[in-house]
């Protein structure tokens, strides 16, 4: 079974840098899907499995830390190379970022 699709599941704490990471991935040619509704994850998986659209060959799916386990479980075992990029930051860094906004 040849894997031709790559999915990076980007998750982490709010304010840790997910948006920065997805911008970099977009510059690398990934199609970015941000805050995809978790209730539609089954439809997303079905679409990815059958799609021949080249835009869906490289996908970065950004999700909240709360929804991460659901997406991770649903993406496990599909015909794609799935990687996880979990971004974290210390409490002091997160507090400083929130103070500056």
Where are these regions (language model features)?
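Conserved nucleotide-sensing/catalytic segment adjacent to the nucleotide-binding pocket
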Residues: 32-79
